[in-house]
């Protein structure tokens, strides 16, 4: 799993590192991160989990991670800054129905700052499941995020971020070069009008300073570098 080292936000934003991007996810609403493997989607998710489990600023910093494909690597999560003692890991063994039921149950439980449903390539989530999860989280303080390879039309998600891989980064001189990391782009695929307040620039002092090289991209796009 890659680890974030820097973030370049859209023009007009304070360069507060990746925190500005992670601060977009609204509590009490369903959000999505979509993108294929090696696109930075999983690494972005780990960065968010790390922020919440180490800050303790929301709901005690407790996170529930529903792992549809049993793909989470605890060692990589710890290297990304996740406090494993604040993480509830639910392994679903590739069973979509089990994953959906677990997420529906956990999002109704008080005390979680974040509930993640990571489906990866498991399959499209039924429209009825989207609606049920949205109703379950609505009005509360929990952030609910689903991650999958593709976005499903008709999803009620308030925020949808799409990731795509740009290029690898190499280290050393030829012929002894080695892969140092990956570069990916994160873009706002959808933001519901009723929640545009979540897109305002973060205030000064909110970020922990994952340094960006410049204001790259345009509109709601970020360029992220991930170290391996």
Indicate residue ranges for each PLM-predicted region.
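Glycine-biased, low-complexity coil/linker segments
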Residues: 203-207, 212-213, 217-218
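Hydrophobic/aromatic beta-strand patches that form the interior of the parallel beta-sheet core
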Residues: 31-33, 64-66, 88-90, 145, ...
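Detector for small/aliphatic-rich hydrophobic stretches
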Residues: 1-65, 79-85, 225-227
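A contiguous pocket-lining binding segment that forms or flanks enzyme active sites
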Residues: 111-152
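Helical mechanochemical/support elements of P-loop NTPase systems and associated helical scaffolds
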Residues: 14-17, 29, 41, 45, ...
């Amino acid at each position: 799993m890659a680890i974030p080292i820097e973030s370049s936000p859209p023009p007009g934003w304070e360069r507060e590192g990746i925190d500005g991007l992670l601060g977009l996810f609204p509590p009490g609403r369903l959000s999505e991160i979509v993108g294929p493997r090696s696109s930075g989607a999983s690494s972005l998710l780990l960065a968010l989990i790390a922020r919440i489990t180490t800050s303790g600023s929301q709901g005690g910093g407790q996170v529930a991670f529903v792992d549809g494909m049993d793909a989470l690597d605890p060692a990589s999560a710890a290297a990304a800054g996740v406090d494993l003692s604040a993480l509830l890991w639910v392994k679903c063994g590739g069973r979509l129905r089990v994953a959906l039921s677990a997420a529906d149950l956990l999002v109704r439980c008080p005390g979680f700052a974040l509930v993640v449903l990571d489906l990866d390539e498991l399959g499209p989530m039924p429209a009825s499941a989207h609606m049920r999860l949205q109703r379950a989280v609505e009005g509360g303080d929990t952030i609910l995020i689903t991650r999958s390879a593709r976005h499903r039309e008709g999803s009620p998600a308030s925020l949808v971020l799409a990731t795509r891989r740009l290029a690898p980064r190499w280290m050393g001189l030829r012929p002894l070069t080695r892969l140092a990391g990956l570069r990916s782009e994160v873009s706002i695929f959808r933001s519901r009008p009723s929640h545009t307040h979540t897109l305002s620039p973060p205030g000064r002092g909110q970020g922990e300073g994952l340094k960006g090289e410049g204001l790259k991209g345009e509109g709601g796009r970020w360029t992220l570098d991930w170290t391996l």
